[in-house]
Amino acid sequence: AELIETLNQLGVNRISLGLQSLNELELNAMNRAHSKEQSLSALNLLNKEKTITLSVDLIYGTPWKSDEQWRGELEFIQGFSSIKHLSAYALTIEEKTVLAHQVNKNIIPPIDEEKAAVQFDLLQKHIEEIGWEAYEISNYCEIGHRAIHNSNYWNFLPYFGFGPSAHSYDGENLRYWNQPNNAKYISAIENQSFPREIEELTEIDRLNEYIMVKLR
């Protein structure tokens, strides 16, 4: 409650929760640090706050999620009046990760792209049925509740990121990101020295990013 009060004072009016899944087995398999119980506790707490709206993240197309479970998750989050925005992503398995190792060792099955496509279609149908809009390939919202911050990414507007690993962009050709280590980040703030990595985008970099983002 104290944190929410502080956020209100700072003008924050939306909180994004990385639920990923509402299935304990799936959370464990994807090496998520939180539990289903913690997710539900956070949802129930934040849903009581009338000054805050919520965005949630979900993952589909996993080896552990059936079509019926996916429908159930989509319907479940609609029961929370504060949830006005959804980011939904198909699971991808990156090289040199625990999941990639498990696939290579046949511990878990590889991603079924046909299954992911079916669940993507179920998502589109659900969004249409509840009257929301799909305004980006992975982002959906109640009318009037697009993510302003994320929209800045897609429209190449400047943005500023706070916290460890947070990325910022000057709107032209400089992109920079903060120290990723929590302890080192806090120490840097205490010493008033804000170390960050900087990338200067070339004209080709910007053109490639423009094409990639606009395809979404």
Language-model regions: role of each:
Residues 1-216:
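C-terminal scaffold of the Radical SAM
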